[in-house]
Amino acid sequence: MKPEYLSIILVEPQGPINIGSVCRAMMNFGVTKLRLVNPTKHYKSLLAKKMALTAFTVLENALIFEDLQSALSDIQVAFGTTRRFGKYRKNFFTPADAAQKLNDAYQDVRSALVLGPEDTGLETKDLDLCQHFITIPTHDGYPSMNLSHAL
């Protein structure tokens, strides 16, 4: 998968520290396209800048959307992240399997990784807009991950 074809979409990210951390993680892997859906009004604060460091350019160039459907309008395939196994969601990828799928089947396709709010994750209506689902195996006693760590 070519990094220039991949967008990271954060749905209603709440904390500028997490947003800055996501920018830094993105730059570590050459991914520079960030889309924010209804972010906190302080998403470009000094805290975000401190966490992003030189990756703050990712945040400065981020596209802002009111809803996920708009953010996905030019995306051909979306991978939604979730820790919840719904009754109709059957095909989950691990991060490694999702990376392999992106590399094998979607190399020249505009793709997105979609992550939800820190406190609730993606809602069903948002997951319904995604073609694939990713879940990260974690300890049953504490399955929720920090936004930047999930990325």
Q: For each predicted feature, which ranges?
A:
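Post-transcriptional modification and biogenesis factors for structured RNAs
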Residues: 1-151
